[in-house]
Amino acid sequence: MNDKIKALLNEQINKELYSAYLYVDIANYYDELDLDGYANYYMIQAQEERDHALLFMKYMQNNGYKVTLEAIAKPDKIY
């Protein structure tokens, strides 16, 4: 696998983890409004995004490639 593909996979891992982080933040927002159904929905979505990141990580590890975790950006509150 060339270096560009490895870099793109690492970037995708960060995007998946950012999405999970964002969904947890949205779930927290709905939880504060006592909208438990919405909060639960977004927590499920967060878990799905985390699982995606773990699949990419496991793929890279199984093929002997280094996983580089970067900082996860803070979500902008627009909701």
Predicted regions, residues:
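Iron-associated oxidoreductase/ferritin-like identity signal
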Residues: 1-79
